[in-house]
Amino acid sequence: MIEDILEEAEESMKKSINHFKSELAGFRTGRASTSLVEDIKIEYYGSRVPIKQVGNVSVPEPNQILIQVWDQNAISPIEKAIMEQLSLNPARQGNTLRITLPPLTQERRKELVKLLHKTTEEAKVAIRNIRRDAKEMIESLEGISEDEIKRALDKLQKITDHYIDEISNLSSSKEKEITELK
């Protein structure tokens, strides 16, 4: 019973970490990355689909993203979505869109670091909330000795610390990436 609660808590924490990683991938660091545009949703034949489903996204140069669109009808919606969501102006060349990323200003880097810290704190709070819920479930179990509960709570804390550390490490490396001058 206790093991099930701990496994469920750890599984939820892994999901939180994966969500945090996907949020980090969207941070613009001055270096081009396919993750910056591939999940942007566009209106395409009446439904909303990510760019990666209507074209091939690549990074030919460190400050450029290239989108080779498979269907001519998707080019305008992609251009519009990129302008709205990233405030970048893609250059059209036939069925290809080229996005050149301007270098980040020092001010923008500071804003990104603030946003990173906020996102990091939200991820840590999510992990702590999972720990709190699991702790309450463990403490409410009937017919379990105090020692077993104590051992389970210690194990839960170790799991929590591991994932909090992982979030901190991911955040630190992303912050270095943002503040690094190119």
UniProtKB/Swiss-Prot annotation:
Assigned keywords, A-Z: Cytoplasm, Protein biosynthesis
GO biological process, one term: translational termination
Record-linked CDD domains: RRF
Signal peptide per UniProt: none
Coiled-coil intervals: none
Location in the cell: Cytoplasm
Gene Ontology CC terms, in alphabetical order: cytoplasm
InterPro entries with a match to the protein in the record: Ribosome_recyc_fac (IPR002661), Ribosome_recyc_fac_dom (IPR023584), RRF_sf (IPR036191)
MF-aspect GO terms: ribosomal large subunit binding
Any Pfam family hit: RRF
Family per record: Belongs to the RRF family.
Biological role stated in the UniProt entry: Responsible for the release of ribosomes from messenger RNA at the termination of protein biosynthesis. May increase the efficiency of translation by recycling ribosomes from one round of translation to another.
The protein, known as: Ribosome-recycling factor
Organism: Hydrogenobaculum sp. (strain Y04AAS1)
